Amino acid sequence: MHLLETRDLTHIYRGDVHALEGVNFTAERKSRIAVIGPNGAGKSTLFKHFNGILKPTSGEVLVRGEPITKENVREVRKFVGIVFQNPDDQIFSPTVEQDIAFGPINLGLDEATVAHRVEEALHLLGIEELRERVPHHLSGGEKKRVAIAGILAMEPQVLVLDEPTAGLDPQGVADLVAFVNRLPEEYGMTVVFSTHHLDLVAEMADYIYVMDKGRVVGSGTVEEVFTRPELLTQTRLDVPPIPKLIRSLRENGVAIDMAYTYEDAKKSFLDAYARRA
């Protein structure tokens, strides 16, 4: 049984706009999944089906093997938490602390449990000093962390992040990557995210879905997807700089191991240098 699954999922908006066409997707426990594709590929629409924000035109969405229904959608939203690309879409309380508490309160939790979850979320995102601040006076990166904290306080098993690095400075991106990579092992969570920053995908994901025009046009491990440049080119994407550079070196006769992350690339270059010395 998959933790999260879609079967032949199709969504048509008013005006006969086909946003999703026969999408099949699965997510397992403690996995990190990237969904990549150009603007308009259907990534955000797909994500909104994961916890019942949108209903399929046809096909189905299964959470822990059960279809999402009117009767169980509240439980589904405890299990699958979504952070939208624009944090202003989900931040609305007078203070950061109140905003993070909103979700747990609406789950019907007692005051002590709510307070504990808020403290945990503030600590996990490193935003304890923001607790009394007005959310709409925060920077874009701070708002993003508050939005994530608000979802984490509900303790979902699946965290869905729509373009989580959008609007973040380099340090904010590095912090987010480190944070996402902690969640599966330390908290047993599954993370599904979309991004246009393909250089980050190998740092953050175990598996990739490639979307274009509402369809899944390819999927596989980081290695399987990034060794198919034609797949990325046809979807107006490009192979990230690290594997592109190493592939070029290999094609020019340099004996160097393929790598996809910064740390692996550093090791490959040092090993190649040692062999030539």
Curated annotation (Swiss-Prot):
Which InterPro entries did the record assign?
AAA+_ATPase (IPR003593), ABC_transporter-like_ATP-bd (IPR003439), ABC_transporter-like_CS (IPR017871), ABC_transpr_CbiO/EcfA_su (IPR015856), Co_trans_ATP-bd (IPR005876), ECF_ABC_transporter_ATP-bd (IPR050095), P-loop_NTPase (IPR027417)
Coiled-coil segments, which residues? none
Pinpoint the ABC transporter domain residues.
Answer: 4-238
Where would you say this protein principally sits, based on its record? membrane
First-tier enzyme category under EC: translocase
Any one of the GO BP annotations: cobalt ion transport
User: Per the UniProt record, which EC number(s) apply here?
Assistant: 7.-.-.-
| Pfam annotation, one family | ABC_tran
What terms describe the molecular function in GO for this protein? Answer: ATP binding; ATP hydrolysis activity; ATPase-coupled transmembrane transporter activity
Q: Which UniProt keywords apply?
A: ATP-binding, Cell membrane, Membrane, Nucleotide-binding, Translocase, Transport
UniProt cross-references to CDD domains, sorted A to Z: ABC_cobalt_CbiO_domain1
Subunit structure, as described in the record = Forms a stable energy-coupling factor (ECF) transporter complex composed of 2 membrane-embedded substrate-binding proteins (S component), 2 ATP-binding proteins (A component) and 2 transmembrane proteins (T component).
Assigned protein family:
Belongs to the ABC transporter superfamily. Energy-coupling factor EcfA family.
NCBIfam families recorded for this chain?
cbiO, PRK13652.1
Listed name of the protein: Energy-coupling factor transporter ATP-binding protein EcfA
The organism named in the record is Methanoculleus marisnigri (strain ATCC 35101 / DSM 1498 / JR1)
